[in-house]
């Protein structure tokens, strides 16, 4: 493949006035070129045919005729480097060049984003409970493991986005994917170094009478030290994923036409959202396999001591990341024909009021550490960018908070098991989140939204989701639980008067450490078999569930003559379930519908040399103000709705029973607060946005409309590749 050679210095087209003052002929270069010799963007004369030889007419000519010389001050063509061929250093065979297109790099970036979402947001969330059980971790320790990803990203975002933005983006991306794969392998390492998982079954703690010493046995296994290994794996995940959502997005955006960019970015983010869905499905299936594969056990998947094969998914994702990184490392600094799209983006940038924009227009700007303070200062002076960052932080707070605790909300409201609630939430997120993300980019492209119109679209989506949040004013009644919300006789219990001990189970010596709810034949839910007064005798009914007979705390049934209990929670008969699910779907859909338009607006309101750095700064703001505190804030208010806390040998554990009405009320308050802030930030951003040109749509007409047949053919090929 012929390589296009360019000089070390960028070529700047001067304005007509400056050209006249210097005595230069400002006739368009294409008119001075010899007939039949195509002119390559970035050079005055073409010495050879190349993939970049796409036009004989300068891209800025029609723009200058329509808007005057002001537009030409901003047009600079930057050197694309020594080669636009796809390959690894000197090895660039012609057969690889079929992948050297925007669609080719989009495929591999989607694969990387899918793996990142599947591992970090899928596998990690799925196996957290298993890790706590297997390695004796407390909840705050597992929370610190999850937060290590965001901590790593915040530490690396400034460095990666600033220097990677002016560097070789595919190489930054490829090495980042390799780091992600390494992090997955490190995360799975404790399974092979901690020894076998062996447990002893003791049914004495479950039934009446209980064995008091069976639960709080002193354990000094030292397995909790593996927390540091898990944190290291997550830290590598965070470092490796940092280039993906900053440099990856800008690399896609700068190599396609501005009208097609939202679609490409939407496909990229859709893959990132489908990744967690696959992670939940694959991770859930792997947890049904015993962690010590090949060894028989008496444990069942319903047992609180069961640990599934949590580590298999990380081995698979790590290997897949290594295979994905290799082709990404082979892509050039710029794809063939990409420079012609720089002119399209120039007039959509937010207009600055001083001369500092001239320095930012220098193609060498942002390549040294000396430019870092000015880069930050230029972004801080851009009110549209700041407001979009704040709006993104409010949306991130809701997304991270609700994605973390929505399964718990569904579990409490509809009396579901943890696996059922997670599966139901996954069914909501896949079409709502994935569909909203893709359609957001599709609408921006289909409606040809530019500038403030994109921000108005984000404002509309936020208002609709704000109205949908009002559904949390509804709630399902809590299932009555003996000793918590109802007395053992069935009457309502005043709030705050908890008493799990009654005359019917006083002689059972029930332990509060073992929570294993059962549903009595009287419609009440009991803390455990022991608290229901059930002896060890069992039988299996037609549905495969264990039924416990002769329970002393359950009133006798006239038909059967004795009270009995069934393992598991009582089912909910809430009639509002369909309505709640529909409106939760609406909130998720419109929240994700605005994500790609908001990202597009961010890319358009800053200058080309700063776009990667701007995305990095935005991600830092979003994570610090939204991603990290979001789950903490939602967890804090949800804990306020707790009625019964777990007693772990004298220490307070997790919440076991929530008050549904209070949980809905607190989520409603949090949702309204952050959605109102999001509406305000988008509205003010739309009001303050001032593009460099009155009509950014006119940039599309800057492309050559009249050219020779060979150039037209080349232009058609470039557009078809986009």
Swiss-Prot record:
The residues covered by the Kazal-like domain are: 498-555
Where does it localize?
Cell membrane
Q: A GO molecular function for this record?
A: organic anion transmembrane transporter activity
What Pfam families does the record point to? Kazal_2, OATP
Query: Which Gene3D superfamilies does the record match to this protein?
Result: 3.30.60.30, MFS general substrate transporter like domains (1.20.1250.20)
Ranges in the Extracellular compartment? Answer: 125-143, 196-222, 294-307, 401-420, 472-580, 639-671
| All ranges on the Cytoplasmic side of the membrane | 1-103, 165-170, 254-272, 333-378, 445-448, 604-612, 690-722
For this UniProt entry, which segments traverse the membrane?
Answer: 104-124, 144-164, 171-195, 223-253, 273-293, 308-332, 379-400, 421-444, 449-471, 581-603, 613-638, 672-689
Official protein name in the record: Solute carrier organic anion transporter family member 4A1
* Organism, as annotated: Homo sapiens
Organism ancestry? Eukaryota, Metazoa, Chordata, Craniata, Vertebrata
